[in-house]
Amino acid sequence: ILATNTSSLSVTEIAARTRRSDRVIGLHFLQPVPQVPLVEVVRGLGTSDATFRQAMDFVRLLGKTGVEVFEYPGYVTTRVILPFLNEAMHVVMEGVATPEAVDTSMRLGYGLQVGPLALADRIGLDEVNRWMQYLFEELGDLKYRPCPLLRKMIRAGHIGVKCGRG
């Protein structure tokens, strides 16, 4: 079995370059891997049921929960979280609330462990921007067009925890 952790390369395209496309699958681990109990198990066009079952067994062996996802740009987690992060940035850019108020509102109001802006900071604003641009190009949906504030922060070198400036 060839498993890839990519969230932007096509499992089907990778499989097409092998002689056993039925044995290629995506295992999308979310960051930080030790703390996140979820893995998206991504079926390419030719992924066999046997390969899928073995991948799910492997994920369980790691003590994680696997969810079946069919290949599509962004899978489930990335597709759903990016508009959320983007909208939080728009709220700050429009002066509706401070970053701290946005994160506190979402954490306490919805029982989240981390607010959307702190999450973007952990992921890295450059990565969030790259993912948004990829989904915007692939899907053409305006909800994935990066907020101007995100691009401004990146240009200023404020890309997140990894560089000490978010």
Model-derived segments and their meaning:
Residues L2-E71, Y75-R79:
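Rossmann-fold dinucleotide-binding core
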